[in-house]
């Protein structure tokens, strides 16, 4: 087959992350076939890293870490108060315990907080997947759909797990499957406040003076599926929120 470096360069730029050294020559004989081959890989779009945890595992780990941190802080506070009262120790120890440490960079010599550690591992795995991609066709699809079904990485330790479990798992499958996985994932439910949505006539809604939260329903209709210029109404949003809330 004749070499077609121009089409190869176009394929790498338009569908991937651009050409690596020697990449144009590698696929010049069949640029289209190279793209299809990346789609056909059994592990296309997947990330396999032993130190990554599921969304549920991340939440449990952070819950336990936070409980231990609060317990340590409480114990330290009790010891300071006891020392200040002269109980169980040298009263002169209190001022020393309260003395400020030497000025240094925040967290110098310490591990980052657990949520930060989880984020950094997820970010590195995502970066490595992009760098290691031969072309990057599938990885760009992952990025597109992660942006379409976005959640807030700043406020959720589940963001990395969400991308792996809802987006990567369905990136080459049916849109309906990805839609269901994304909208029902805890990261999305929390991001769009659906955990706060309560049936207004339910016992819980009446006792707590709470009602429906329409954020998720509106986002699904307005941004994730139909779009802003379609014919759904406010009544559709409200009824959809009722269905989602149960």
Residue ranges of each PLM-predicted region?
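Mature N-terminal segment immediately following signal peptide/propeptide cleavage
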Residues: 7-19
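Alpha-helical structural elements
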Residues: 10, 58-60, 140
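Primarily short, surface-exposed interaction patches in extracytoplasmic proteins
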Residues: 1-4, 19-29, 35-36, 117-246
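Active-site-surrounding "flap" and adjacent substrate/cofactor-binding loops of secreted or lumenal enzymes
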Residues: 5-6, 21-117, 202, 206-210
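Short linear motifs at secondary-structure transitions and domain/linker junctions
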Residues: 13, 105, 119-121
């Amino acid at each position: 087959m004749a070499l077609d470096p121009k089409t190869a360069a176009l394929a790498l730029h338009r569908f991937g992350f651009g050409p690596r050294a020697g990449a144009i020559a590698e696929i010049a004989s069949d640029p289209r076939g190279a793209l299809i081959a990346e789609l056909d890989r059994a592990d296309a779009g997947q990330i396999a890293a032993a130190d990554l945890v599921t969304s549920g595992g991340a939440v449990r780990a952070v819950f336990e870490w936070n409980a231990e941190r609060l317990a340590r802080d409480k114990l330290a506070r009790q010891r300071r108060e006891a020392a200040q009262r002269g109980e169980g120790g040298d009263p002169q120890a209190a001022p020393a315990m309260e003395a400020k440490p030497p000025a240094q960079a925040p967290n110098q010599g310490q591990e980052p907080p657990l949520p930060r550690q989880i984020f950094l591992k997820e970010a590195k795995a995502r970066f490595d997947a992009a760098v290691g991609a031969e072309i990057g066709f599938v990885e760009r699809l992952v990025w597109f759909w992660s942006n379409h079904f976005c959640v807030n990485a700043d406020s959720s330790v589940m963001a990395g797990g969400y991308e792996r479990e809802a987006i990567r798992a369905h990136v080459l499958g049916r849109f309906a499957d990805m839609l269901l996985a994304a909208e029902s994932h805890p990261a999305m439910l929390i991001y769009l406040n659906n955990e706060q949505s309560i049936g207004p006539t339910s016992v819980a809604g009446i006792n707590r003076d709470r009602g429906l939260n329409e954020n998720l329903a509106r986002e699904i209709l307005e941004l994730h599926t139909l779009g802003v210029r379609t014919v759904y109404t406010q009544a559709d949003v409200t009824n959809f929120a009722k269905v989602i809330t149960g």
